[in-house]
Structures are given as C-alpha cells and as structure tokens.
A protein has these predicted regions:
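His/acidic metal-ligating clusters that form di-metal
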Residues: 13-15, 24-101, 181
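Binuclear metal-dependent phosphoesterase catalytic core
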Residues: 93, 100-170
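A short loop-to-beta-strand structural motif that recurs across blades of beta-propeller domains
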Residues: 119, 317-320, 358-360, 400-403
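Long, low-complexity serine/threonine/glycine- and acidic-rich segments characteristic of extracellular
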Residues: 144-246
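Short glycine/acidic-enriched loop and turn motifs that connect beta-strands
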Residues: 265-266, 310-314, 357-358, 401
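Extracytoplasmic beta-rich repeat domains
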Residues: 284-298, 308-317, 329-344, 369-390, ...
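Short loop/turn segments that connect beta-strands within beta-propeller blades
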Residues: 323-326, 363-367, 406-410
C-alpha cells in the first residue's frame, strides 16, 4: 500500500503518515510528507474533524506542529483536530492535550514496555465527532471469580445496612463485553434456592451489590453461585460456600505503618511484628471506581491509600483513602492522569506522581492538595515510575526529571543533570545507604 494516505468516514478525515526514522533510511523525506499533507488538508471540508495516525508522537507538548524544516511547518491546531494515534512508545497512555487526545496502545502480543498487559483498543467516533475509547485486555477466556463472600469463610452483614450481604465479583472476557451478572443464593445442604438477582457494574472488571438476607438463614452454610453473561452468548460461572453470621465480629490487629513499597524507602522488605495467625479472614473489600496497575496500597494512621489508572479518554483516575477497619471511603482526589506505580506517605502527607508528569502532595486526613509540581522529562511525555519519601524528602521523576523535593513545601532541592531516559525498565526509586 501507499506510504501515506487519507480517507473520509462521516464527518471525519483520517490521515495516515509514516515515521521519519527507523532502523533503515527511508526513501522519502519530511519535506515529501509535508508537501503531501499540505495538499491533502487543503481539500478537507470546513469544520471537518481530523484524526491523525503516525507510528510516533508528532509533538510531546501541546503545540501539534508538523515541521519539515524552518520554512515548512503545519499547525494541526489550525484544523478541527480531534486526536493523534501512535504506538512507538510501547505503552497504554491517553492524554487530553488542550482539547486534542493523543492515544498510545502497547503491543497486542506481548504488552507494553512498562509491564502493561497485552491489550488492544476499541475507539468510537460518534455523529458529533466525540471520541470514546475502551482498552481491552487480550488472551482472557471467559472467567469469573467471587471476591466476597470468600469460599470457606464466615461472612457478616453490611455494617451500614442490616441483613444485607455484600457481594463482589470480578469477571472478564477479551472477545466480548459483560452484559450482566446474576446470582443465586441457596442452602448448601439441600440446594434449595433462597434468593436470586442481578449485580451492578462497578468497573470494567468488577460487579457487586448487596443481597437482602432472610432472618432464618443465620448461622447456615450457604452457596453463592454467580454467572456472567457475555455479549456474544458465552457464560462463566463460579460458586462460593460460606457461613452467614449477621453479627460476626472481626478482630483487627493493627501493625506498623506501611508507608511505601515494602514498608521502607530502601524497599528491603518490612518486618511484620503483629501477632497475626493463619488462616486469615477477609474483613472487607471495596471498589476504587477504576483499575489499579502497579500501585500497591500503603497503610498509615488507620487509613489505606491507593491510586488508580485509566488508559481511556474517560481518565477516571484518583488517589483514594479508606478507613482501615471498615473499608469506608474517606476521600477521593482526582488526578490529571493515571498513577501507574507506587505512592508514599510520611508525616500526614501522601505523595504520588501521574503518567502526565504531575507530582501531588495531599493532606492524608482530608485529601486536600497541599502542593503540586510539574516534572520535566525533557520532551519525553510519559512517567510510569514509582516514587518514595524518606526523612522529609520526596524522590520523584526519572532521568532528566529525577528530583528531590521538600515534603512540606514542594520546593525543589535538586534535579538530576547527568543522564536522561527513554523507553526502558520501569522502576521505583530506592534510598540506599546514608
């Protein structure tokens, strides 16, 4: 096929252009691409939407300039540009760059360079030229798993509403969407049906709800059978057997704070000094409202902190705090983009960095933003590394953006000047020695 081409569907003009560099020299120049682009875009209709494709990102900043040389420049913002799709960086990443989406998807066969799972992306453009996306995870057969109530455990009623059993289910299928999830609660001794119904979708993976429990089921061993129905007609089923005790009281044994990955900034693996004994009993489960990637939860001040990721244009991304004992949501702070990796806590402050290179410091009690910094990666647009904090200093960023910040004020203490970064290993910063 041609090296570059364009086509129209509805009110959208799609333009596919080639990369200007690679393992071997090309038989075309950026000037050749510029000349074709200029002529092609001169023919589009007024107010027609424009969506661009290229192997690489045109510009990491918001300028959206195509530059062949100083005398041959095209400004894509002069058109009704809606998005640019690219793949060179090998990660899953969506940015809203001042009204234009840049959308990158990792490789289908092996996932992203940043450990992103294998995936593909579904993109829709409606009659009003609005773009929606859904990242689909690959190679997953129809599956379903019951998160709560857990198999062979005792389950209690909700702490807020009496006689209601909380239910949480994870289900997914690569080739089709989950249309609905149903449940049947039955007596495990005689298989007599007690109640049945449907669960509600919480995220693309999780469905949940509560079951109104009859009073005469107290203390009985019950079976919960859940079934996922997928849009192509396939199904998946799972069963959990448990004992229902309405007033079952769980004992919480609090250990030391776990304020960063592996408990300390050296990531040497924290020591659990609590008196926990096996087997463990699920105390609570909750849903953050979005997916979680490499961010492990941290615990401090009787709170559990976690951050979420969303690789779609919805950018449903948050830093969340939950009550340690009940799982109740205490606060939620919306970030500009996905927090892909570890977060940290010290002296009442939670710190996190998102994929768009924003560094946040939040008050752990209220979730209020204390300060925010922009991490400059010197033309590289994506931050997937984890940060840490130690003795009042936040260590964040990577490469040209690797910096130390005062935890209380956000003031920059130092910035790395010795080396830069590109695509490579995904890390969490570690404090070693003094």
């Amino acid at each position: 096929g041609p090296t570059w081409y364009s086509f129209d569907i509805g009110n959208v003009h799609y333009v596919v252009t080639p990369i200007d560099h690679g393992d071997n020299p090309t038989n075309y120049t950026q000037r050749d691409v510029y000349n074709w682009l200029k002529n092609d875009l001169a023919l589009i209709k007024k107010d027609q939407a424009l969506i661009l494709f290229n192997h690489d990102l045109f510009t990491p900043n918001d300028s959206f300039i195509f530059k062949a040389d100083d005398d041959h420049i095209l400004n894509f913002r002069s058109f009704n540009t809606k998005a640019q799709l690219y793949g060179h960086m090998h990660y899953n990443y969506v940015r809203n760059q001042n009204g234009i989406y840049t959308i990158c998807t990792g490789t289908l066969d092996k996932g992203g360079i940043d450990h992103s799972p294998s995936s593909f992306r579904e993109i829709k453009v409606d009659a009003n030229d609005n773009i929606t996306t859904q990242l689909r995870y690959a190679f997953i057969e129809p599956q379903i798993a019951i998160v709560s109530p857990m198999n062979n455990q005792t389950a209690a009623a909700c702490t807020i509403t009496e006689d209601q059993l909380p239910v949480s289910v994870n289900t997914y299928y690569s080739q089709a969407k989950t249309s609905h999830v149903s449940y049947i609660l039955s007596d495990s001794e005689n298989n007599q049906e007690i109640v049945k119904g449907d669960l509600a979708s919480r995220t693309e993976w999780n469905w949940g709800g509560t079951i109104q429990m009859p009073a005469n089921e107290m203390g009985k061993r019950l079976n919960l059978t859940v079934t996922s129905f997928f849009s192509n007609g396939k199904k998946a089923t799972a069963t959990s057997q448990f004992i229902y005790q309405k007033d079952f009281k769980l004992s919480t044994i609090a250990g030391e704070d776990w304020n960063t990955l592996l408990q300390n900034a050296a990531h040497s693996g924290g020591v659990n000094n609590s008196q926990i004994k096996l087997p463990l009993q699920l105390q609570w489960t909750t849903n953050t409202g979005s997916n979680i990637f490499m961010c492990s939860p941290i615990i401090a001040g009787q709170k559990v902190f976690i951050a979420t990721t969303d690789d779609n244009v919805s950018l449903n991304t948050f830093i969340c705090a939950f009550d340690f004992n009940s799982g109740k949501l205490l606060w939620k702070f919306r970030t500009a983009n996905s927090v892909k990796n570890t977060i940290a806590y010290e002296n009442g402050i939670v710190v996190a960095q998102d994929a768009s290179c924003n560094l946040y410091a939040l008050d752990s009690e209220s979730g209020k933003l204390l300060w925010k910094q922009s991490i400059n990666l010197d033309s590289y647009p994506y931050l997937t590394e984890g940060l840490t904090v130690d003795k009042g200093v936040v260590y964040a960023g990577i490469g040209a953006g690797l910096s130390a910040y005062n935890l209380k004020t956000g003031q920059t203490i130092w910035t790395n000047k010795d080396w830069k970064q590109r695509e490579g290993s995904t890390t969490t910063l570690t404090i070693a020695g003094d």
